[in-house]
Every structure is written in structure tokens, then in C-alpha cells.
Amino acid sequence: VLKKDEAVEKLKTLRSSSAQQRAYFDSFWSLAGVYTYADQWAYIAPKDNALSVSYLRNITDPRREDIRVTMNRIHADVTRLVSELDPMRIDYELVQRSVRYLVPKLIGKRFFDKYLKQVHALEILSEKNWARFIIGSMIVRRTLTAQGAERFVAGGEKRVRNFQPGVALTYPSEMLRDPSASTTNMARDEEIVAQEKPRTTNWLKRYFGADVKTQSKLGQLLRFQRQFQAAGGLGLDRHATASTLPAVLVQETYYQDPDEVRPWAWAMFSYCDPSVDRDRVIPLGKGLVKNPFFGLPFHPYHYDTQIASPWGRGAPHIQIAGQDILNIAITWLVRNMQAGSGKWMVEKNTMSPPEKARMLNNRLDEVIEYTKQNQYSAAPQRTPPTQVSPAVLDFINGAPTWMKDSLNLSDVQSGKTSKRGESGGAIELKLNQANAPLEMVRRRDDRTTEDLLMGLYCDVLNPRWARLDQVREVLGEDTPDEMVRALLRDDPKKYISHVNLLPSTNRPKTPSEQQQEITTLHGQGVIDNSEDALWELMLRGVNASSDMKNAHDKQLMEINQMLHEGEYVPVYMAENHGYEKRTVAWFVSQPAAMALTEEDRELLTQHYNDHYQAEMAEMQGQQMMQGSPEPGRPSPPSEAFRGSDMANAGAVAPAAQM
């Protein structure tokens, strides 16, 4: 079994062995930031016994000897990648181990849906994409945040505190991994993983109760991030490193133990004080403790993975070579534009240097005066202008296309076609081919997000900190108490085997695509009638019938009123009974309806029956109106009068009373 002293030594070894690799990746990632946001013309070179990003002077540098132009194509392609893989929702299903656990699964799904919104999980999954596509990797980690002050229980012998599980973003630069790591799957292939981050002493006091005195400042500890913060060109490095808050380096380390069945069984929180000894590791709290999370809490998302590499590559690293060539071509073109009509050619000793500087320019209102040495002296004249090759212009104009090609992006993904009149089948084939590389990234994202959701679900309902009152508050008062207790009765790992992420999370369809899909299914006979097609579209958020949408929303409000107030809402003849009746049936058919009480079901059943009776009465009235003559017109003869003398034929029917 792993001991605290052994855990401390392992962490010290990890910190010292990974320092050089971390320094290299800091420069590598900073270069990607420069090419995405800043002036480019950059490279990695040794400086002060370390690697750092260096720059050639460009057009914005007043010390330049000549101009260098930046035509940034990388930022546009990164933005496009981010928008292509931006999740719009989190759709998933919990898979229970047996039918016996159906109720905890259904109530757990309802609880977890609300909890994901509470911890802003969708925002975190969306924000990760910017860093992931720029530097190549980004980590979404599970967190435990202490809330409120400690409370004494059991006669003052024990102290308890509320903990709130959640999610947060972690940059790869904060991670400590063994330099021998050769895969991007740290949870599967490594034995020790740590996160090291500067934290203020107030943070340590708030979360660990440790009163640490130090001479180190937060700005000093952030210097390892300085070139990465400077990469965006906003001067963030100067502001962050100016902080004078007292701080130390805090490590959060997780260990595998061959003597434990549970993976990543141990965790240790510690800190280093660089002002005293930056290599000394001081454990916090109880030191080595059981891992409070379900497995390793770090979930990395990657873009372009390399063989035998611990991290992915971003789009800028793929496009840097092409971007440099484009910048060189643009710079050459602008230099030729500046040359105008060619250079001035002046006979020696006919003009002084001040006269040349004053008169030999492109201004039409400047007079050129020169001294003629003899009758054969030549006046100043320009040389022929530099000829711009059409091939260079074609190269520059084609740059956006071949730079997108390096990322496997295509114009057809933006709705552009290669020629007019191209068939829909050809466009769809091109689109599928263009989307194949992005689909591979989505599949990897799906697997990572499934692991993230499974871990977070087990963390949230962990019996160590899941409280009945907190779960009941999230679920609301309409959930029966016995179902809430059933949810907390067992460990989530006992009744949930895994999480399946649904395609709508990373592959959302536009309203027009959904409408086309439903229309096709209706045309093929998969959906029976047009009303079913309109209903399916409405449930997907595409409203093609205002009457159906209004009736659906109104009925949901009536259902909510009946369930919360316990009072019946009457039905009126003028309502759209068909749509509202369908809404009631749809509502009680959902898995969440398992939580309805018997009284709730009786109210909804009575409401449904009243809509049904009103609908039948309306249909009977319409039939009667169809069988009656219009006011002032004779009614048709009955069968009894057929063949008679029609003596009473032509009687006028009274007008229908409304």
C-alpha cells in the first residue's frame, strides 16, 4: 500500500524530471498563440539557457529596416473549427446495470440534467475548443469546491463541510506528466499525474485551513506563463506578473496503486514555497488520502494527435509553414508596390545627398533641380518598374484554399459549390468527404465526454457528500421523497454502468436540416401523416404550425399549474382539443412522469378525458351542421317521402342557433 513518504518522493521526482519538457511545451504553445492572434514572423530559439519565442521585426515595429507584412489566415480557420465543433446541448442517456434500478436511473437523469445547468457544464465544454484548436490540447477537469464554514457534529468530535462537485478548465501547461509518456491517454497509461498551479495563501487558508507565510508573490510564480500570455499581443504578461499577492505552488497529485482494486485510488494535496526551497514538497491536510473523485478527474480533449506524443497539435502548428510562405509573398508584393515606377538613377556628383532626400520622391509638386556637369550629363530618371509575376498573384489568391486544405477543411462546408448547377448528390458526397476528419475528432470527443459525465455523475451522488436536502432542492418539491431516497440509497457505480452521449450533442442539425429530414421521412411513409411530422418538428424546436405550438405551450402551463397547486384546470370548448390532448399524452409518456403522484395522475386523466369529450362534442356538432340545410333553403326529402306526392316538400328549416 502506498505510504505518504513514498508519495512525496514520487512527486518530487516527477517535478524535477518533467521541468525541461514543460519549458519546451510552453514555448511550443506560445508559438501557436503568436500565429493565431499576434504579428507572426516568430520562431523558437535558445535564449538565456532556455527556449523562448523570438520574432522578426514586422511592419508595426518602428525599429525595422524593411517592411514585413502579416496576412493572418490561421485565425479565420481556427474560428471555423471552433464553430464546427461547438456543442449546443448535452444530450445523453444513463445505462443502468439491470431493470431493478430503473427508478434511480430515471430520477438520476432528471437530477443530473438540472445539475449540469447549475455548474455551467455546457459553457465549459464550449470554451475548451478555443485552446484545444490553438495549442492542440485542453483539459476539462472535475472539481470539488468547499462551501461554507465547517460544522461540528457528534458532540463536537467531528467536523463536516459542504462540497460542491463541478467542472473547470485546466491548461496542459499546469500538468505534471512523466517525460516518458508517449500517449494522450494519461488515465490509462500512467501511474502518477499531477496538476501544479500558483495559489494565494488566502486560497490555502480558505480550502485547507493552512496558515502559510511566504515571501513569494503570485506575479513571480506566474512568470513560467509569461511568454504564453504575451503571445496574444495584449500585454497580459505585464499585468499578471505584476501581482504582489503572497502565493505558493500547489500540487494536486493522483496515484495508481497495484495493491488497490480501484484505479487511481490515492490523492495528495501539497505545496512548495519557492522563497524557501522550491524542491521541498509539504503535504496539506491529512497528506495522502483516498481519491475523492471517481477515477482520474482530468479529461483531455485533443485536436491533431501525433505518434508517441503526450499532447496534441493545434491548427497553427499545421499551418505555420504555409502562413510563412504567404507572408513572404505578400511582403514581396507590398515592397514592389512601394517601389512605384522603379528606383531613381542619378549621375554621380550632380546632386548632393540633401537634395536627393528632398527632391527624389513620388510627389508631383516637387521640382527636381540638378547641376549639369557638361553637355553630356544625364538628368535624373527612374529605372523600369519591377514586373509583378501573375504566378505570384495566383499564389496569393489561392492561399486561403490551400491553407484550409492543410486542415482538411473545404468550402463546401460553408455552403459553397465548385461550379454552378452541381447536383445535390455530388454536393452531399463532397460534404461527407470534407466532414470525415472532423467526424473523427467528434468521435474522440464523444468518448471523452462520456467519461467526464460518468465521473461527474458518480461524484455528485457520492454518499460521502451528497445530502438529501441538496438533492431535493435540485429536483424540486414535485418529486416524491421515497424516490429521492431511492436515488441516494446506493452508490451510483452500483446501478449505472456507463453513459452514452447522443449524437445531437456534437452533431446538432440546423432547423432547415431537421425540416428536410422530417419531410423526407414523411414522404417515404415512415411518418404516417403531416400532423405527426409537424409534431416531431416542434419537439425539435422547429415551429411550422403556430396553432400547434401555442396549444402545446398553453397545455404545459396548465399541467404545471395543476401539479403545483393541486387544483383542476377546466377545459373550454373554444380550445384546440386535439393538440392539447396530444400534449397531455406526451407529458405522461415521458420517463420523468414516473415521479407523478396518484393525485397528479387523476388530475391529468380527468383533464385528458374532458378534452376528449369536448373534441367529440365538437365533431358531432360539425356533423350535424353538415347534415342540416343552410338557413332559408329547403331540406332534402327523407326516404319515406321518396315516390310520394311530395305534399310537404319544400319546408324551410330554421336557422341554426349559435
Give the positions of each predicted feature.
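Generic, well-ordered alpha-helical scaffold segments in large soluble proteins
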Residues: 111-118, 322-336, 340, 362-370, ...
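Short amphipathic alpha-helical heptad-repeat segments
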Residues: 573-585
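Extended, charged amphipathic alpha-helical segments
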Residues: 235-420
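Short coil/turn segments at secondary-structure boundaries
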Residues: 91-95, 123-131, 142-146, 337-349, ...
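Long, highly charged low-complexity segments enriched in Glu/Asp and Lys/Arg with interspersed Ser/Thr
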Residues: 528-558, 591-632
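Charge-rich, acidic-biased intrinsically disordered regions
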Residues: 34-53, 143, 346-364, 420-427, ...
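Extended amphipathic alpha-helical segments with heptad-repeat/coiled-coil character used for oligomerization
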Residues: 143, 390, 424-550
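Extended, helix-rich architectural segments
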Residues: 1-266, 270-272, 276, 388-398, ...
